[in-house]
């Protein structure tokens, strides 16, 4: 086995091999799991899709952000190529990860519009800084207008934004 093949297999096995087998037996339906593309960013779109399909997963959660699988500056050219590569392997691309935290960001509308046109339904937003001095309610208030503007853009583009709480040590 080549080193590259071993690394692909090991990366996928770490997160995919055991997930869902008990649930699939219990309900008789195989869950459709999407693989977050970050661990395999060094692969091109075709190799990524082939690897994820070989692992038995149902889709790809693409990173569409600076230094991601798709760079925001090239989203109109590259995201359709990435999605097509996935579809050729029978995979879905219904979700993506971005660095978007504001509707005013230079590539926000282009990324969201292109993603929706490619069939992406939801995206994970970038992270907001928690302010210890403001606390939870104050931090929410601080970001309320920014999130409202992003919600308006999401509706315009036909996509749903999701936020992940992510603690930084």
Model-identified regions with their sequence ranges:
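Active-site acidic/histidine proton-transfer and metal-coordination neighborhood
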Residues: 10-16, 47-50, 66, 92, ...
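C-terminal segment of N-terminal export signals and the immediately downstream linker at the start
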Residues: 20-43, 47-51
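N-terminal export signals
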Residues: 5-25
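N-terminal secretory signal peptides
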Residues: 1-2
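Alpha-helix-loop-beta-strand connector modules within alpha/beta enzyme cores
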Residues: 79-95, 150-154
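Short, well-ordered coil/turn segments that N-cap beta-strands
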Residues: 28-33, 56-58, 87-94, 119-121, ...
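Glycine-rich, proline-tolerant flexible connector loops at the mouths of alpha/beta enzymes
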Residues: 63-81
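Active-site mouth loops of central-metabolism enzymes
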Residues: 33-43, 97-105, 137
């Amino acid at each position: 086995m080549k080193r590259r093949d071993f690394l692909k297999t090991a990366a996928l096995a770490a997160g995919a091999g055991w997930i869902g087998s008990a649930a699939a037996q219990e309900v008789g339906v195989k869950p459709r799991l999407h693989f977050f593309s970050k661990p395999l960013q060094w692969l091109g779109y075709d190799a990524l899709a082939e690897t994820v399909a070989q692992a038995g997963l149902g889709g790809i959660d693409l990173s569409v952000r600076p230094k991601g699988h798709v760079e925001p500056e090239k989203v109109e050219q590259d995201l359709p190529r990435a999605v097509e590569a996935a579809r050729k392997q029978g995979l879905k691309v219904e979700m993506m990860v971005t660095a978007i935290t504001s509707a005013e960001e230079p590539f926000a509308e282009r990324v969201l519009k292109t993603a929706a046109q490619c069939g992406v339904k939801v995206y994970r937003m970038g992270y907001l800084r928690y302010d210890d001095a403001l606390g939870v309610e104050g931090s929410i208030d601080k970001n309320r207008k920014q999130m409202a503007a992003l919600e308006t853009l999401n509706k315009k583009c036909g996509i749903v934004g999701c936020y992940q709480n992510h603690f930084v040590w």
